[in-house]
Design a protein with these regions (language model features):
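Short alpha-helices
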Residues: 112, 116-137
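Gly/Ser/Thr-rich loops at beta-strand to alpha-helix junctions
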Residues: 12-14, 74, 97-100, 121-130, ...
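General beta-strand structural signal in soluble alpha/beta enzymes
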Residues: 92-93, 118-122, 148, 172
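Rossmann-fold NAD(P)-binding glycine/threonine-rich loop
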Residues: 94-118
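Oxidoreductase and adenylate-handling cofactor-binding alpha/beta cores
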Residues: 128-144, 159-171
């Protein structure tokens, strides 16, 4: 049996991470990276793999078994998910929880019409944490499940920040509220709102002359990302961002109490 031939769509942080993971799996090989940028400007780490423009992927339809979609959930995946699923088997980590049913319907329709298989929303959460919840709930059938993310960088929320007009760069940290974690670990099975479980901390580099008040308002009121949380927005320089916020740690807990 030959190796699974992989295509990567999007070459940001996720795409680069997927490339490194493919190298560690002997039954896979990277055939091509697809980008909306000028392919000549994208330097990948895999010898023999090609860099192609997004619009040229159809030409490799018979050379790729699975496309891994590495775009953001805010604006990328809702567009490219169904588009790519019409021609290829796909997998992605779409994580805007409230919009998963809509995204599922759109990708499902395209995949069925193209006679392909698409697996959606199997990243961090939903994904690995979903399996943790399922495993815990199958053991403690009666009880309450709690998920805490962080402290760490949410790549999806960071991507959403960077797409706001006037934002040059930015990063977002998800911070679990310790008092809430302690309540859950006590076994008291508290009823906690979204706002009571996490804080969101945003560090933003604004474009020169940008309206910072408008940027802050756009972040704090963004549906499905920040509007249900207590969110702080701190404006910093590009140099501060590179010096103090260039790493991408993350973590979290799934706790089942019953």
């Amino acid at each position: 049996m030959g190796k699974i031939r992989i295509g990567i769509v999007g070459y940001g942080n996720i795409g680069r991470g997927v490339e490194q993971s493919i190298k560690r799996n002997d039954d896979m090989e990277l055939k091509a990276v697809f980008t909306r940028r000028d392919p000549a400007s994208v330097k990948i780490q895999t010898e023999g793999a090609e860099v192609k423009h997004f619009d040229d992927m159809e030409a490799m339809k018979d050379e790729i078994d699975v496309m891994i979609l590495c775009g953001g959930s805010a604006t990328d995946l809702p567009v490219i998910g169904p588009k790519v699923a019409a021609s290829f088997n796909t997998i992605d980590s779409f994580d805007t929880h409230a919009k998963i049913p809509e995204y599922f319907a759109n990708v499902d329709k395209a995949a069925k019409e193209g006679k392909n298989v698409s697996i959606i929303s199997v990243g961090w959460d939903p994904g690995m944490f979903s399996l943790n919840r399922l495993y815990a709930e199958s053991i403690l059938v009666q009880g309450s499940t709690y998920t805490f993310w962080g402290k760490g960088v949410s790549q999806g929320h960071s991507d959403a920040i960077r797409r706001i007009e006037g934002v040059k760069n930015g990063i977002q940290y998800t911070v679990p509220i310790e008092a809430a974690v302690d309540q859950v670990r006590s076994g008291s099975e508290p009823e906690l709102t979204t706002r009571q479980k996490h804080l969101r901390e945003c560090y933003v580099v604004a474009e020169e002359g940008a309206d910072k008040a408008a940027i802050e308002e756009a972040i704090k009121t963004m549906p499905n990302y920040f509007d249900e949380y207590d969110t702080t927005v701190t404006f910093i320089t590009e140099e501060e961002l590179k010096k103090n916020h260039s790493k991408m740690p993350h973590g979290g807990f799934v706790i089942r109490s019953g």
